Swiss-Prot record:
Function: May play a role in signal transduction pathways that involve calcium as a second messenger. Functions in signal transduction pathways that positively regulate responses to drought, osmotic, and dehydration stress. Regulates expression of stress-associated genes in response to drought. Involved in tolerance to drought stress by increasing proline and soluble sugars, and improving stomatal closure. Required for pollen maturation and spikelet fertility.
Full protein name: Calcium-dependent protein kinase 9
Binding, Ca(2+) 1: D415, D417, N419, R421, E426
Ranges of compositional bias, category Low complexity: 28-40
Up-regulation conditions: By infection with the rice blast fungus (M.oryzae). Induced by abscisic acid (ABA), salt stress and osmotic shock.
């Protein structure tokens, strides 16, 4: 058994050196000397510490930390030898996470890790444990991301709206982060589940988001990825606290510092991020986008392609005329407009947002229902349209034997009664047999997404589509095959009749309302038919952004920014 380490972080001093953004605009600083460290403490009004004893390691200047240069192998001894938490948290030798916590059912999966229910063996307190296998940390960037996330979570204050990191462990195989359990569901899901949704409810949620930004900025942390999915309720009670849970893209910053790396989620990304010259004001913009969606149910900047979304963000012309904006108070609209100002210098600070009359008196915000249209929009916001589901099934049915060999074997294993279809229970039992630990809510979500005909079970095509749903649709041959399935006459377009034929139910009927919705959503040039380019844009929009890995997003957004520079949409800061 390799060495292990553990920490129960409480203050910044216990954490050690918080890592800097490894793609930061500034050059890396050399390792701090005793002189520079003392000078830094004096700038912050602290008394200089005495010179450390010989052979003792001096505490680094947090702003001069550079990410590790190690490039771990994909597995084996090289990956195990990487000390991810070295210099970030103090060591506690030979204590394993399972010594203190009993790990239970899976709660969810992320890019690097898996989160399980963790029960304190002594107190029986229920927490969440995110385990990050070292074999998944393939590059120095991956290692630096985890180090920075741990340092940031440990340095943030004990605030009711911030999930608390309770302990961090490291052994030869993985890093384990034990934190507060938030099992009350996502922000939007709770809104949809409520029978009545009002401006006052939106104000309450928006105030929590603003409090998170204020707490982060006060401690020198820029979040950089504020979005509804990163806010969970602590419990299922109606008055449960809403908490920010993900700091994977957050960075430490100093006043006046500028950043260049393009990160975040497209709908919530500030224009200056696309220009690669930004500071903490980006969090105010993202919070403003969340508030806009809370009030009307759709994002303020929308298009069917990534470049279209980016151009809409750069223009910054949000729509305040459509339903339900006419019935929303002037105070609410005033705050949203201020937060979505394209000039970051004119945006309010987090404290100014909280002091705005609409949020300062959030409990007295109008209690008039915003209408079912908002709840319906919020529900549809993250769902694929029916055409996209059908297209994924077509792709699945035309994959080569080599591409689906493993999936075919799994299908045969799960189809225990050999009737050519898999029920949800068979899916659960089969995944258990093959050692999968996919969380039950995720199984149900995939089942619902892939069950195109809604009959409660998956045939082979739908089953393979589950896998396609989780992959980036980058193979043009696959997309062309799916397009030709709909384009029966080979005209190069999918017309309304072909769309109706492809989406007809067993009786041969196609819902006109569904067809109208798909055409409105996909037919961007409004010529009454869907071109191949429009089809590809539909298939590559939305889902990719939520499922893409962090590294993939970095490269994708860099490419997007370069294309916007080339076509003159943005001008780089000098």
């Amino acid at each position: 058994m390799g060495n292990t380490c553990c920490v129960a972080p409480a203050t910044t001093d216990e954490v050690g050196a918080p890592p800097r953004d490894h793609h930061h605009a500034a050059k890396k600083s050399p390792a701090p000397s005793a002189t520079t460290t003392t000078a830094t403490r004096q700038r912050h009004g602290q008394e200089p510490k005495p010179k450390p004893k010989p052979r003792a390691r001096a505490k680094p200047n947090p702003y001069d930390w550079a990410p590790p240069r190690v490039l771990p192998a994909r597995g084996g001894a090289a990956a195990s030898a990487v000390r991810v938490l070295e210099g970030v948290v103090p060591h506690h030798p030979r204590l394993r996470v399972t010594d203190k916590y009993q790990l239970g059912r899976e709660l969810g999966r992320g890019e690097f890790g898996v989160t399980h229910l963790a029960t304190d063996r002594a107190t029986r307190e229920r927490l969440a444990c995110k385990s990050i296998p070292k074999r998944r940390l393939r590059t120095a960037v991956d290692v630096a991301d985890v180090r920075r996330e741990v340092a940031i979570m440990a340095s943030l204050p004990d605030h009711p709206a911030l999930v608390r990191l309770r302990a961090a462990y490291e052994d030869a195989d993985a890093v384990h982060l034990v934190m507060e359990l938030c099992d009350g569901g996502e922000l939007f899901d709770r809104i949809v589940a409520r029978g009545r949704y009002t401006e006052r409810a939106a104000a309450a949620a928006a105030r929590t988001v603003a409090e998170v930004v204020r707490a982060c900025h006060a401690h020198g942390v820029m979040h950089r990825d504020l979005k509804p999915e990163n806010f969970l309720y602590a419990g299922k009670a109606e008055d449960a606290q809403l908490k920010a849970i993900d700091f994977g893209l957050s960075v430490f910053f100093r006043p006046g510092e500028r950043f260049r790396e393009i990160v975040g989620s497209p709908y919530y990304m500030a224009p200056e991020v696309l220009r690669r010259d930004y500071g903490p004001e980006v969090d105010i913009w993202s919070a403003g986008v969340i508030l806009y969606i809370l009030l009307c149910g759709v994002p303020p900047f929308w298009a069917e392609t990534e470049q279209g979304v980016a151009r809409a963000i750069l223009r910054g012309a949000a729509d305040f005329d459509r339903e339900p904006w006419p019935r929303i108070s002037r105070a609410a609209k005033s705050l949203v407009r201020q937060m979505l100002d394209v000039d970051p210098r004119r945006r309010p600070t987090a404290q100014q947002v909280l002091d705005h009359p609409w949020l300062h008196h959030a409990a007295r915000a109008p209690n008039v229902p915003l209408g079912d249209v908002v709840r319906a929009r919020l529900k549809q916001f993250s769902l694929m349209n029916r055409l996209k589901k059908k297209a994924m099934r077509v792709i699945a049915e035309h994959l080569s034997v080599e591409e689906v060999e493993v999936i075919k074997d799994m299908f045969a294993l799960m189809d225990t009664d050999n009737n050519g279809r898999v029920t949800l229970q068979e899916l659960k039992d089969g995944l258990t047999k093959v050692g999968s630990k996919l969380a039950e809510p995720e199984m149900e979500l995939l089942m619902e997404a892939a069950d195109v005909d809604g009959n409660g079970y998956l045939d082979y095509g739908e089953f393979v589509a589950v896998t396609i749903h989780l992959q980036r649709l980058s193979n043009d041959n696959h997309l062309r095959t799916a397009f030709l399935f709909f384009d029966k006459d080979g005209s190069g377009y999918i017309d309304r009749a072909e769309l109706a034929d492809a989406l007809a139910d067993d009786s041969g009927h196609a819902d006109d309302a569904v067809l109208d919705h798909i055409l409105r959503e996909v037919d961007t040039d409004k010529d009454g038919r869907i071109s191949y380019e429009e089809f590809v844009a539909m298939m590559k929009s939305g889902t990719d952004w939520r499922k893409a890995s962090r590294q993939y997003s970095r490269e994708r957004f860099k490419t997007l920014s370069n294309s916007l520079i080339k076509d003159g949409s943005i001008t780089m800061a000098r």
